[in-house]
Curated annotation (Swiss-Prot):
This is Legumin B. Residues 55-264, 348-496 form the Cupin type-1 domain. Keywords: Disulfide bond, Seed storage protein, Signal, Storage protein. Disulfide bonds join 50-83, 126-342. Residues 314-323 have a biased composition (Acidic residues). It comes from Gossypium hirsutum (Upland cotton).
Length: 516
């Protein structure tokens, strides 16, 4: 009897020990296990030539008009984009416009510059746990539809998308919806070449939208680029089509269990509406009126931020998702399963009240990285939203571990970028709608004009770091005064002023007598 009890106790102890070990291993490794099977450790990016002697602030080169909007692409052959290994685009979606379902071969990060809308992303194998009610009724009965999660978009949102994940966007707001997006074609998740590719599941978009403005014939494209021709309007180009167009209609009909007539409709052979179509019969979420009123009140608070309430509103970016999770009975835990494959958070808001750095006389900086949007750990991307007031300065610094692709969202200002040779490869005024790439380790400084200066910067690292040259947390403060004095050939008193004259952190207020 005693032997049997001892044996049972030993077996229970062994099972408990293995369970604890498994739990510990899960907790210590959950940050390294991407849910869709990517490698455990971030892989090196595709290396590109970065012999940049001169940079230019760029405007979009290719424009493609659709039925309910337009899509613009920056020239991917520009040296600065080749260096960073990225493509850059902008969607302008009219009211009731639908950006057709599509996916890309590389991770994407986009920013809502203007307007509001609805975003849906479909992860393979995840259940359709959400319901919406259609405005169209059949036999006087409302039709309810099950689907995967929908996300509200509003100005200032940053949204992340893994490679190969299909998504769509609908403008249900009262004004135009403008999105700017960076596609990281140099990311290891993209196992094709470093050319932009967009795969549409529906419609018949122009070929240029599918290829990011690039021509099918590389030689033709290079010749056109050398001649300096600007392709502003390409709305009539054909040859895009969707991925279903290439299948035989009878095989497509068998796969979906439909007749061939409907299968041919899926292939959209005569559809010339483009990539953004008008959604005649939209849909609204439950309690739409109450939610709209809440959004309007929230907008009033953001226009007049109360900094003393910052602690209460730090989680604003994810409160909607958290409410939905509580409604379905989910709870966060410390067992390494905080974010499962199907409940992954893709969106982060950047309201004024959640800024990482704030200077009441200078402006604010808000960072979106893997700490506040964990999916970025697997995409190896991050973002920075900057707001500078009249004549304020963003401290001179360099990006330690990432390229920074800067898009100007409001106002104007001056940006200076310096290479390893101590040469200014960019020193110009920039304004809304322009893009400039700051290569890794190149020193940069930004100064706002009289109208202020705002930007969104996409960075090619999940936790991009900067090293400041001036300010309270700069490299100058970390060097001994004698090292500074001898390095620059100045007196100790001058070195002390160099170290301590600026007590602000990253955003500097304008000094009296300073000029643009």
């Amino acid at each position: 009897m005693a032997y049997t009890s001892l044996l049972s106790f030993s077996v229970c102890l062994l099972v408990l020990f293995h369970g604890c070990c498994a739990q510990i291993d899960l907790v210590t490794n959950h940050h390294q296990d991407p849910p869709w099977g990517q490698p455990q450790q971030p892989q090196p990016r595709h290396q590109s030539q970065c012999q940049l002697q001169n940079l230019n602030a760029l405007q979009p080169k290719h424009r493609f008009r659709s039925e309910a909007g337009e899509t613009e692409f920056w020239d991917q052959n520009e040296d600065q984009f080749q260096c960073a290994g990225v493509a850059f685009l902008r969607h302008k979606i009219q009211r009731k416009g639908l950006l057709l379902p599509s996916f890309t071969s590389a991770p994407m990060l986009f920013y809502v510059e203007q307007g509001e809308g609805i975003h849906g992303a479909v992860f393979p194998g995840c259940p359709e746990t959400y319901q919406s009610q259609s405005q169209q009724n059949i036999q006087d009965r409302p039709q309810r539809d099950q689907h995967q999660k929908l996300r509200r978009l509003k100005e200032g949102d940053v949204v992340a998308l893994p490679a190969g994940v299909a998504h769509w966007i609908f403008n249900n707001g009262r004004s135009q919806l403008v999105l700017v997006a960076l596609v990281d074609v140099g990311n290891d998740a993209n196992q094709l070449d470093e050319n932009f590719r967009k795969f549409f599941l529906a419609g018949s978009p122009q070929g240029g939208v599918v290829r990011g403005g690039q021509s099918r014939d590389r030689n033709q494209r290079q010749s056109r680029t050398q001649r300096g021709e600007r392709e502003e309007e390409e709305s009539q180009e054909s040859g895009g089509n969707n991925v279903l167009s290439g299948f035989r209609d009878n095989l497509l009909a068998q796969a979906f269990g439909i007749d061939t007539r409907l299968a041919r409709k899926l292939q959209n052979e005569r559809d010339n509406r483009g990539a953004i179509v008008r959604m005649e019969h939209g849909f609204e979420w439950p309690e739409e009126g109450q939610r709209r009123q809440g959004r309007e009140e929230e907008g009033e608070e953001e226009r007049e931020p109360k900094w003393q309430r910052r602690q209460e509103s730090q989680e604003e970016g994810s409160e909607e998702e958290e409410r939905e999770e509580r409604g379905r009975g989910r709870r966060r835990s410390g067992n390494g399963l905080e974010e499962t494959f199907c409940s992954m958070r893709l969106k982060h808001r950047t309201p004024a009240s959640s800024a990482d750095v704030f200077n009441p006389r200078g402006g604010r900086i808000t960072t979106v990285n893997s700490f506040n949007l964990p999916i970025l750990q697997y995409l190896q991307l991050s973002a920075e939203r900057g707001v500078l007031y009249n004549n304020a300065i963003y401290a001179p610094h360099w990006n330690m571990n990432a390229h920074s692709i800067v898009y100007i969202t409001r106002g104007n200002g001056r940006i200076q970028i310096v290479s390893e040779n101590g040469e200014a490869i960019f020193d110009e005024q920039v304004e809304r709608g322009q893009v400039i790439t700051v290569p890794q380790n190149h020193a940069v400084v930004k100064k706002a004009g009289r109208r202020g200066f705002e930007w969104i910067a996409f960075k090619t690292n999940a936790n991009a770091k900067i090293s400041q040259i001036a300010g309270r947390v700069s490299i100058m403060r970390g060097l001994p005064v004698d090292v500074l004095a001898n390095s620059f050939g100045i007196s100790r008193e001058e070195a002390m002023r160099l170290k301590h004259n600026r007590q602000e952190v990253s955003v500097f207020s304008p000094r009296q007598g300073s000029q643009q």
